[in-house]
């Protein structure tokens, strides 16, 4: 973000979400929208997050198909959401296993 690579930020976050969906069971080769729907259906994206996910989908489409660079605020929003989703999916899953396993 400090080098103003806002398009790159949007695209890498999009790619990360694709990888997460496939790692969690989505079929590889589907559309980005299908990956996001899969994450919703599996409960990784909750109803309050749905609007934000749709915004990321639209932003990702713009970054992919338009030469106009996204602004800093938009890229930061996508990055923040992606980071938090990774924490929820992976860190919380790990922590849950640590504290709920019977000893």
Region locations from a protein language model:
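Short, solvent-exposed segments of well-ordered alpha helices
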Residues: 3-7, 47, 69
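Charge-enriched, short contiguous segments at helix-coil
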Residues: 51-58, 62-103
